[in-house]
């Protein structure tokens, strides 16, 4: 039994917070469980304090100091617990102590009351403090707490690694690790060395798991890179295959284009072989070389003489024309003689199916016209001056006619339009000598000439050189000859104009006297589908009233605007690159290009427009723009607008194209003209076979009802009046002026005053 002096000492030891050794002292003193008052004080302070019930008076102090960290660890581990949980824990421990005390008292032998009480106190202390199972449980709790803290620290330090570790660590592996750790806890003595060893093992495992995770991530990255490289290779292969396909498509397109060109060349060769040409000369200013042409069998008008002493600045150019062009004959030949004449030509040339000839039974002189067409570059035998711009500008169907009796008749149907001027010895009412016929052998030689492509190319080049020479030598008489015949000198408003016109007239008269003066008639192109040779007359004439300005008032050209200034050079470039392109297509190209240009690019042309307008205003202060009146056309007795007439002719041309494409063979007989007017004979040539398209020319195929473009001005009784001939506008403004305004109103025609006496073109 405990003595009274011992009680204060025991309470004093119980109140101390220093943990004691679990092993009891030799004197048998027992450390009691902390009192309820102590627990309440700790709860009020909210400081968790959990003391192991250890014996106080153990003499070995190192043992007591050894377990100080353990008690501290338990305090820290129990830190998060609430005071209520601590209180319940203490009560449970007290109950366990009391339950363990009862069997111990019953098992003791009967002794003295003091000894029994003392033994019971020792048993209580041993049951509460000294059992190894209790120590093992406390150490297991400490180790679990350490593991939890380590895992929390790892989670805080590496939060992103947690999902990968949880994926790698399966539930079975976790259970195995926990079981292994709990099984080894029994052998732990609770020393810091053992705890450090466990910590090292845990860190080793963590390092292994981290390295495994890094390896898996590296393998995953490698797989990603490999997949990306494979995708890139596939993309490159697809691009390569696409490029190869595009290249193959381009090669196929080139092959198709080459095949198309070959087909076109074959068609041209076939046309040249099937339709051998007759050669007609384009007469130079003198006829020195015409004798050589006559010796070769070319058909020449009889009114020309060979002058041996004259110089020949221009070599004669023999130009073939198309089968669709007309052949001229003399009035001395009747219809039967004309049929025999053409039959002889066809027999000599061995014309293939599809060949057509047009005839004119009345005229001053005759000439034969050949089938295939080459560019005509010079169409006069007299030296009427031709302006530089008129020579440089190719003639096309969209050009308005401009006339002058001093100029040669040139058809406004692109640069390969031949024309023929014929001399009348005694006037339009007198008969003249029939045209000479060439021998069949000469026709055969001309066939060989045209079939030779090199010879044709050479002829074209020589013709272009002749153009340049004409432009250089005849630049001085630019565009003013047309005024000579349309305006009387007495009607001039100023003395300056009168003097200029007199000088021009004198120059023209001198050259005409040197070369021989020619009068001109007008040809009516008539075609009939009859095969019996009957004269199918189909006339259509265009009349223009001279409204808006007086017939004797001179025409003043409008100043060019910015577009005209720019299009002047551009049109020439396009025509040099594509000489057979139709003017309407060129106008469309120029219009689209002009719209695509920026204002900065257009600025210099607007400045030029302002300069030209100012210059025009200074030169003509009283100028007032007066547009031409609208034209009408008489077709088979019906009065039609020009647009309606063009639509009719377009439909007829389309029908004729379809007719010839089918390959039907028909001979068009010679048609007689309904009316022969004194004046010029103009031959409208056919386009070159080098451009077998619908845009080459209006007259790309024979068409019925080709209209007579006729003016009623100046025909007085029986006096032979010199008619004005159709010719292209000069390039310096008239043709561009008409292009722009005809697009605005296709029925309104703009041009020179002399054109009031000529109706527009059939296109």
UniProtKB/Swiss-Prot annotation:
Example of a GO MF term: transcription cis-regulatory region binding
Record CDD domains: HMG-box_EGL13-like
InterPro entries in UniProt: HMG_box_dom (IPR009071), HMG_box_dom_sf (IPR036910), SOX/SOX-like_TF (IPR051356)
Biased composition (Acidic residues): 727-752
DNA-binding residues (ranges): 556-624
Record-listed Phosphothreonine modification sites: 131, 372
Basic and acidic residues bias: start-end ranges: 716-726
Positions of the UniProt region annotated as Disordered: 1-30, 77-138, 369-426, 714-763
Keywords: Activator, Coiled coil, Differentiation, DNA-binding, Nucleus, Phosphoprotein, Transcription, Transcription regulation
Pfam families: HMG_box
Gene Ontology annotations for the cellular component aspect, listed alphabetically: nucleus; transcription regulator complex
GO biological process: asymmetric neuroblast division; cartilage condensation; cartilage development; cell fate commitment; cellular response to transforming growth factor beta stimulus; central nervous system neuron differentiation; chondrocyte differentiation; in utero embryonic development
Biased composition (Polar residues): 102-111
Modification Phosphoserine occurs at: 21, 370, 411, 414, 439
Record function comment: Transcription factor involved in chondrocytes differentiation and cartilage formation. Specifically binds the 5'-AACAAT-3' DNA motif present in enhancers and super-enhancers and promotes expression of genes important for chondrogenesis, including cartilage matrix protein-coding genes, such as COL2A1 and AGC1.
Subunit structure: Forms homodimers and heterodimers with SOX6.
Protein name as it appears in the record: Transcription factor SOX-5
Species of origin: Rattus norvegicus
């Amino acid at each position: 039994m405990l003595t009274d002096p011992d009680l204060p000492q025991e309470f004093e030891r119980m109140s101390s917070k220093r943990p004691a050794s679990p092993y009891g002292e030799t004197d048998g003193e027992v450390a009691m469980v902390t009192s309820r008052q102590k627990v309440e004080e700790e709860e009020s302070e909210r400081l968790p304090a959990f003391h192991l019930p250890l014996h106080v008076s153990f003499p070995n102090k190192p043992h007591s100091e050894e377990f100080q960290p353990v008690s501290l660890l338990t305090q820290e581990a129990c830190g998060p617990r609430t005071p209520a949980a601590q209180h319940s824990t203490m009560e449970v421990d007290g109950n366990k102590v009391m339950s363990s005390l009862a069997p111990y008292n019953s098992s003791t032998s009967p002794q003295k009351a003091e000894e029994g009480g003392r033994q019971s106190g020792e048993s209580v202390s041993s049951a509460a403090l000294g059992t190894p199972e209790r120590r093992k449980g406390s150490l297991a709790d400490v180790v679990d707490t350490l593991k939890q803290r380590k895992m929390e620290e790892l989670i805080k330090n590496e939060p992103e690694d947690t999902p990968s570790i949880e994926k790698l660590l399966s539930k079975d592996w976790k259970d195995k690790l926990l079981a292994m750790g709990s099984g080894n806890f029994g052998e732990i003595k609770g020393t810091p060395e053992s705890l450090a060893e466990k910590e090292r093992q845990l860190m080793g495992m963590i390092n292994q798991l981290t390295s495994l995770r890094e390896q898996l991530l590296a393998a995953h990255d490698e797989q990603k890179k490999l997949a990306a490289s494979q995708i890139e290779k596939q993309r490159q292969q697809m691009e390569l295959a696409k490029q190869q396909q595009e290249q193959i498509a381009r090669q196929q397109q080139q092959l198709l284009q080459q095949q198309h060109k070959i087909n076109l060349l074959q068609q041209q060769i076939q046309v040249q072989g099937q339709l051998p040409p007759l050669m007609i000369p384009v007469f130079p200013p003198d006829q020195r070389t015409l004798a050589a042409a006559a010796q070769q069998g070319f058909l020449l008008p009889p009114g020309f003489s060979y002058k041996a002493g004259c110089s020949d600045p221009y070599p004669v150019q023999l130009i073939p024309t198309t089968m669709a062009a007309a052949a001229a004959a003399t009035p001395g030949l009747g219809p039967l003689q004309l049929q025999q004449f053409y039959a002889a030509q066809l027999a000599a040339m061995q014309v293939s199916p599809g060949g057509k000839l047009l005839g004119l039974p009345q005229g001053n002189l005759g000439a034969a016209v050949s089938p295939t067409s080459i560019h005509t570059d010079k169409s006069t035998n007299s030296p009427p001056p031709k302006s530089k711009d008129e020579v440089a500008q190719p003639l096309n169907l969209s050009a308005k006619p401009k006339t002058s009796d001093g100029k040669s008749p040139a058809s406004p149907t692109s640069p390969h339009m031949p024309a023929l001027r014929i001399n009348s010895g005694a006037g339009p009412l007198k008969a003249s000598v029939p045209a000479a016929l060439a021998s069949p052998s000469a026709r055969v030689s001309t066939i060989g000439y045209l079939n030779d492509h090199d010879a044709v190319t050479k002829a074209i080049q020589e013709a272009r050189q002749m153009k340049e020479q004409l432009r250089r030598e005849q630049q001085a008489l630019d565009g003013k000859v047309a005024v000579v015949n349309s305006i009387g000198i007495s009607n001039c408003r100023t003395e300056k104009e009168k003097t200029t016109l007199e000088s021009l007239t004198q120059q023209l008269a001198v050259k005409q006297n040197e070369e021989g003066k020619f009068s001109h008639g007008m040809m009516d192109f008539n075609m009939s589908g009859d095969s019996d040779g009957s004269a199918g007359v189909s006339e259509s004439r265009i009349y223009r009233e001279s409204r808006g300005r007086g017939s004797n008032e001179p025409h003043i050209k409008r100043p060019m605007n910015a577009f005209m200034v720019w299009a002047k050079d551009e049109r020439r470039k396009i025509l040099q690159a594509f000489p057979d392109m139709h003017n309407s297509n060129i106008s469309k190209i120029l219009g689209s290009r002009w719209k695509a240009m920026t204002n900065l690019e257009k600025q210099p042309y607007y400045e030029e427009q302002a300069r030209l307008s100012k210059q025009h205003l200074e030169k003509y202060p009283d100028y007032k723009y007066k547009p031409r009146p609208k034209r009408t056309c008489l077709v088979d007795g019906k009065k039609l607008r020009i647009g309606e007439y063009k639509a009719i002719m377009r439909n007829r041309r389309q029908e004729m194209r379809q007719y010839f494409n089918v390959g039907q063979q028909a001979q068009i007989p010679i048609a007689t003209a309904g009316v022969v007017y004194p004046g010029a004979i103009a031959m409208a040539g056919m386009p070159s076979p080098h451009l077998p398209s619908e845009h080459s020319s209006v007259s790309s195929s024979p068409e019925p009802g080709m209209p007579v473009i006729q003016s009623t001005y100046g025909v007085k009784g029986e006096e032979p009046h010199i008619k004005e001939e159709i010719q292209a506008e000069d390039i310096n403004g008239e043709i561009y002026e008409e292009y722009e305004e005809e697009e605005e109103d296709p029925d309104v025609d703009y041009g020179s005053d002399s054109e009031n006496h000529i109706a527009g073109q059939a296109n």
